[in-house]
């Protein structure tokens, strides 16, 4: 019992801390929790727990910005995202654990590289956005969250503030719901993992709120370095050890 309480406290602190860091640094989000979840739950359950937590987080963002959501763009994104998320989720349920762990490690390293070298993102048309949805749905099913890589394409459509936040979050909700249906059918998502993911959502929301409060008081570069260092170290460990 004591061990479970300590583990729960660790996960709450990790959720709060990573949300705070990502809110100040401007990127990272749920991705920062991946190595923590992998260490605690293993790679397969880690993606399921992160998916539940991300669904709760994105769902609240959709609600707060519901009047500004571009529903047409969400439908276009979903046309590619839903079938691809099903395919990715099915692959996750059967993928060897060591291989899956290394895929997550590569993804964490790719996050840092993408941030450093990404080109200016051109505006893509409707077909391109459906293709983006497919790539996002498949990738999200394997690693839990690809938001930081997808966000520039929403911004390139001229979206700002509530329209951007709500539309990007609504697109993520579609992917997460699709994945959870498959995870539930394949017994990857259990009551235990689902409740853990939901329980961590308030801690992440509190961390994000705190991060916004301290954003103007602390040097952002310090937080960016910390986030990137954490992603690199975690990615290398997962890649080299396979869990």
Language model segments and positions:
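Transmembrane helix exit motif
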Residues: 58-66, 89, 94, 103-127, ...
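Transmembrane helix-loop junction
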Residues: 39, 93, 156-157, 216, ...
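Interfacial loop-to-transmembrane junctions
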Residues: 208-231
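Membrane-interface helix termini and inter-helical loops of multi-pass transporters
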Residues: 89-98, 183-195, 240-243
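Residues within membrane-spanning alpha-helices of integral membrane proteins
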Residues: 8, 51, 105-108, 112, ...
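Loop-to-transmembrane alpha-helix entry segments
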Residues: 71-76, 94-108, 126, 193, ...
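Small-residue-rich segments of transmembrane alpha-helices in multi-pass membrane proteins
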Residues: 35, 39-44, 78-89, 111, ...
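Small-residue-rich hydrophobic segments that form or flank transmembrane alpha-helices
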Residues: 8-76, 133-137, 147-201, 208
